[in-house]
A protein has these predicted regions:
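Two-component system phosphorelay core
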Residues: 1-122
Length: 122
């Protein structure tokens, strides 16, 4: 079972996440576990599309991450993803270049915290 206090301590809005999950803590936990299961592949995609300078695909990944992060209450990461998605739409490579590394770091830190809260750290 998720430790809600740990999630909140690290900035997740668990009330918002639960709202998106019909106020069902078990469903919320399933959403977080699915989010974690997809994280390695999503990071790989973001890194690949960034290196290839494929802004369309990078923007699609950012859009998806924006929504899934919001659904679990990860507002800060969701907002960062929104900014990158918008930068892709505007072909603002300078903004993408300045934000990409921090965005990936932020995402990795969040997944580490989620693993800790879910008791998946060893």
């Amino acid at each position: 079972m998720l430790n809600m206090e740990t999630l909140e301590k690290y900035g997740l809005d668990t009330a918002e996440g639960l709202t998106y999950c019909a106020d069902d803590p078990e469903f919320y936990e399933e959403m977080i576990l699915e989010y974690l299961n997809e994280s390695a592949g999503r990071i790989e995609e973001l890194e690949s599309f960034y290196k290839l300078r494929n802004l369309k695909r990078y923007g699609i990944c950012a859009h998806s991450l924006k929504n899934t992060s919001r659904m679990i209450g990860a507002r800060e990461l969701s907002e960062s993803a929104r900014e990158l998605e918008q930068a892709c739409k505007e072909n603002d490579e300078a903004l993408i270049d300045s934000a990409h590394e921090h965005f990936i770091k932020q995402y990795k830190e969040l997944t580490t915290l989620l693993r800790e809260a879910a008791g998946l750290m060893r």
